[in-house]
Amino acid sequence: MEHIKTLIIGSGPAGYTAAIYAGRADLKPVLYAGLQPGGQLTTTTIVENFPGYPNGVDGNQMMMDMREQAERFGTEMRDGSITHIEFENRPYRVEDEDGKAFTTDTIIIATGATAKYLGLEDEEKYKGQGVSACATCDGFFYRKRTVAVVGGGDTACEEALYLASLAKKVYMIVRKPFLRAAEIMQQRVKEKENIEILFETNTKGLFGDNGVEGAHLVRHLGEPNEEAFDIAIDGFFLAIGHKPNTELFKGHIDLDEQGFIKVVPGTATTNLPGIFAAGDVADPIYRQGVVAAGSGAKAAIEADRYLQKL
């Protein structure tokens, strides 16, 4: 049976950076790219907040650059996903989706987190053309424009406040008749003059010839006073949470109440020896490419130190 020193599950900034560091440490890493090679950044039209690209860079191109750099240092790239891990014994026995089995001394988990969407057909149609799940990433493109934020929790309020500092007008589309955010966040939102909260409102669709130009909304859905109306917007931001891709690890690796992998603070170390986590899968707070890359570097360094003690 094949044996490898370091297995990296998932690509994106965390996985590829871990691969670069692991390759340079001669760990001969094998990286499984997963269902979306390159991760969420491959759907981002332009990335302007990652160091080293003064004029910005296409998200897909940046991931291709990282992949090429990882390959240069000896990373073996494999398509597909890991479907099974035997956590009870070491070295860990692993199987991929094609049934190929092998063992590994260390595992770096970089499977990411998936933004939750409403499930509208239009969301996919306009993704990267007005639809976003990251105000910090894309808010700059909507300076002096009108945007909408979907959600009523802390994340939605944070996104709305951030966008309000850039945009001319921010609508908050809230399904319930109240906000679920902390009281201080609610107060800040309500005090912001360019934020308008649309309570008891659902999004039915988006429209526009060249990207998002507006949203079809319904107030009091399913009630006698149901009312359909449209708003003109340039950007549509989802802020209804992220789902970490941790199904494979449940019951074995410690997760928090949201399903994110718990790591020892300041490290990439999980509760299992030789298993490390990097990127959004272990980050319920920041979810930024540059942060993910840094955590990927930490995971690879820790994997190297772990192997040196074997």
Q: Model regions: which residues?
A:
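Glycine/small-residue-rich loop that forms an oxyanion/phosphate-binding "nest" at active or ligand-binding sites
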Residues: 77-140
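FAD-site-proximal beta/loop scaffold in flavoenzymes
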Residues: 119, 125-141, 240-291, 295, ...
